[in-house]
Curated annotation (Swiss-Prot):
Subcellular compartments: Cytoplasm
GO cellular component, one term: cytoplasm
Top-level taxon of the source organism: Bacteria
Molecular functions (GO terms): folic acid binding
Lineage, top ranks: Bacteria, Pseudomonadati, Pseudomonadota, Gammaproteobacteria, Enterobacterales
The protein, known as: tRNA-modifying protein YgfZ
Gene3D superfamilies on file: 2.40.30.160, 3.30.70.1630, Aminomethyltransferase beta-barrel domains
Native source species: Escherichia coli O6:K15:H31 (strain 536 / UPEC)
Length: 326
């Protein structure tokens, strides 16, 4: 990709984030085009893509036959098909799996590294972009297209925008915002996704979890009314038979080192510590606080105390901005 990522700065929590423009280099774009695009995606992902309008984007899962997620996808309509954003570390294997049945359909599935992914968040993000685009997305219309640019709106943890655009527009936006906005890399966007409770599936956790173990049902990413798709039987069983015993949690606190994706944590049990959970993502903020996204049992006590393995510091549960009640 010719557009150079911005240098990293320590990320900031959403409540204190100044206006910030981010390069989302740890995320990647992919597309499906062709006459059978909608039908094909409908048979592959957990969401009901046939009901998606041009104004919507949503988080869906692409599962294996056992209902375990290869990846989750931030999906939106694009040209005569769809585009999606996922972690760069899982894009190649996810596309390999998605293409397995494509020979029988009129579709072209491909990575897209021509376009650039940017994020805008922080203080008065909307006002900063209002000078640069004729229309901005909102709750009512979450996707807006203008020329070569697609803008996606996010409500949590605070209003922010994901911009999919060409290199020329990315350079223009950088030049226009450089004076007033801080520049940062994708760690800041990752910190915001963790705060928002959006599950982050990197390569270490691909093929490990059913969608409900990462709260996808609470984020509107699973349709239980649509026709069949790969892994549907297991995903449905988890709902209707109560087979899912896990959930995604947000922990904050201190740690002398950041846990890596796929690592477990330790839960305090009286005087002892017991291993628990699987870390999806973790970030250290500029104030020294550590935020961790972890899949654990869904019946954790809200006052539970955790730590990174053998660490002297502790982590506690923070509420997510959505409810898991069905």
């Amino acid at each position: 990709m010719a557009f150079t990522p911005f240098p990293p700065r320590q990320p900031t929590a959403s409540a204190r984030l100044p206006l910030t423009l981010m390069t989302l280099d740890d995320w990647a774009l992919a597309t499906i085009t062709g006459a059978d695009s909608e039908k094909y995606m409908q048979g592959q992902v957990t969401a009901d893509v046939s009901q998606m309008t041009e104004d919507q984007h949503l988080l869906a899962a692409h599962c294996d036959a056992k209902g375990k997620m290869w990846s989750n996808l931030r999906l939106f309509r694009d040209g005569d098909g769809f585009a999606w954003i996922e972690r760069r570390s899982v894009r190649e294997p996810q596309l390999t799996e998605l293409k397995k049945y494509a020979v029988f359909s009129k579709v072209t599935i491909a990575p897209d590294d021509e376009r650039v992914l940017l994020g805008v968040a922080g203080f008065q993000a909307r006002a900063a972009l209002a000078n640069l685009f004729s229309e901005l997305p909102s709750r009512e219309k979450q996707v807006v297209k203008e020329g070569a640019t697609t803008l996606l709106w996010f409500e949590h943890p605070a209003e922010r925008f994901l911009i999919v655009t060409d290199e020329a527009t990315a350079n223009m936006l950088t030049d226009k915002l450089r004076g007033e906005a801080e520049l940062n890399n994708s760690q800041q966007w990752l910190a915001l996704n963790i705060e928002a409770g959006f599950p982050v599936i990197d390569a270490a956790n691909s093929g490990q979890f059913i969608p409900q173990a990462t709260n996808l049902q609470a984020l509107g990413g699973i349709s239980f009314k649509k026709g069949c798709y790969t892994g549907q039987e297991m995903v449905a069983r988890a709902k209707f038979r109560g087979a899912n015993k896990r959930a995604l949690w947000l922990l904050t606190g201190s740690a002398s080192r950041l846990p890596e994706a796929g690592e477990d944590l330790e839960l305090k049990m009286g005087e002892n510590w017991r291993r628990t959970g699987t870390v999806l993502a973790a970030v250290k903020l500029e104030d020294g606080q550590v935020v961790v996204q972890v899949v654990m049992n869904n019946d954790m006590e809200p006052d539970s105390i955790f730590r990174v393995r053998d660490d002297a510091n502790t982590l506690r549960i923070e509420p997510l901005p959505y409810s898991l009640e069905e």
